[in-house]
């Protein structure tokens, strides 16, 4: 136990410029307070937050796991940092990825678990990666997902500097169901702070306006009353987003998903805010989309270009 606290003490001292003084009891008390602030102690187990992964794509990347940003067991996030963490502050790639709105008793299906590759891409390319899990229907219906995005954004703004990240350069990425939660967060100002707190947005293969053909998982989140779907959609509020947007869907997406993406693009363009649009070549996950294919039609290059633009313009 003492070794664990010493490791965390050195980490916090290096980052925050703190010095350790006083009795051991005072030291442990002060450290515990800081641990709670940054969410490093999720459940009282005291697990050391950083670890490495053997995957080639994550070589040289360190993780801080299961950092709590809300009260629910699913309100956790992971942070990935690279070797350059200590040399400068970095843009943040914040990923909300989920293949469904629902899970049995609010527990996510393992097939829909977040993947590390997306945030490893961030950490290995001069960014800090953050991936977010959120509450699921039927236990947590609309607008729980958008509220969770708001809470996670708040956590990042309060704490990401401890990991070498810049809170004023957050690029918010939503994939699949996560894309709706991100779009809903941006489109409904009543669910967030007046300033959405993001410098750029990436939306991938999402639905943005539920309709009467909603499947069972979607109905468990949006409700069975289709007359309420219009008010719960991302339209028209999403067109008021001022941050630059990258919009993507896959060539193998269902016609319904493609139509959703095309509708969002049309509405944004009509509002004078055309997104950069990419059609991915058969990508079935955000992590695979971040690996460039032979035709360079993945998301890696557009995201890196967006980040460079934000840094050069000093946004927000």
Model-derived features: where do they sit?
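N-terminal cap/lid segment of alpha/beta-hydrolase-fold proteins
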Residues: 27-88
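Alpha/beta-hydrolase
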Residues: 96, 204, 280-283
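C-terminal catalytic histidine-bearing segment of alpha/beta-hydrolase fold enzymes
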Residues: 248, 255-265, 269-316
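Primarily recognizes the serine-hydrolase "nucleophile elbow" in alpha/beta-hydrolase
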Residues: 151-217, 229
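Short beta-strand/loop motif that positions the catalytic acidic residue
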Residues: 241, 247-249
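Catalytic nucleophile-loop/oxyanion-hole region of alpha/beta-hydrolase
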Residues: 109-114, 118-119, 130-167, 293-294
């Amino acid at each position: 136990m003492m070794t664990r606290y010493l490791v965390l003490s050195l980490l916090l001292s290096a980052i925050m410029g703190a010095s350790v003084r006083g009795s051991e009891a005072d030291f442990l008390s002060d450290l515990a307070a800081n641990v709670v602030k940054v969410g490093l102690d999720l459940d009282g187990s005291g697990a050391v937050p950083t670890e490495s992964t053997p995957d080639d794509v994550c070589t040289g990347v360190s993780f801080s796991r299961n950092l709590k940003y809300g009260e629910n067991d699913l309100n956790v996030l992971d942070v990935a940092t690279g070797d350059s963490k200590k040399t400068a502050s970095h843009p943040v790639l914040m990923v909300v990825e989920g293949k469904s709105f629902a899970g049995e008793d609010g527990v996510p299906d393992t097939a829909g678990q977040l993947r590390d590759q997306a945030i490893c891409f961030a950490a290995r390319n001069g960014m800090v990666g953050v991936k977010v899990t959120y509450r699921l229907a039927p236990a947590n219906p609309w607008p729980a997902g958008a509220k969770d995005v708001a809470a996670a954004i708040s956590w990042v703004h309060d704490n990401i500097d401890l990991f070498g990240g810049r809170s004023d350069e957050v690029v918010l990425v939503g994939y699949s169901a996560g894309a709706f939660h991100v779009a809903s967060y941006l489109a409904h100002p009543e669910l967030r702070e007046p300033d959405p707190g993001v410098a750029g947005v990436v939306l991938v293969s999402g639905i943005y306006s539920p309709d009467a053909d909603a499947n069972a998982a979607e109905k468990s989140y949006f409700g069975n009353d289709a007359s309420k779907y219009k008010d719960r959609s991302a339209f028209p509020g999403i067109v008021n987003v001022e941050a630059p947007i990258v919009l993507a869907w896959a060539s193998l997406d269902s016609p319904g998903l493609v139509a959703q993406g095309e509708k969002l693009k049309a509405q944004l363009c009509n509002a004078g805010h055309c997104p950069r649009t990419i059609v991915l070549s058969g990508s079935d996950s955000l992590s695979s989309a971040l690996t460039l294919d032979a035709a360079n039609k993945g998301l890696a290059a557009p995201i890196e270009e967006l980040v460079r633009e934000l840094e050069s313009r000093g946004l927000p």
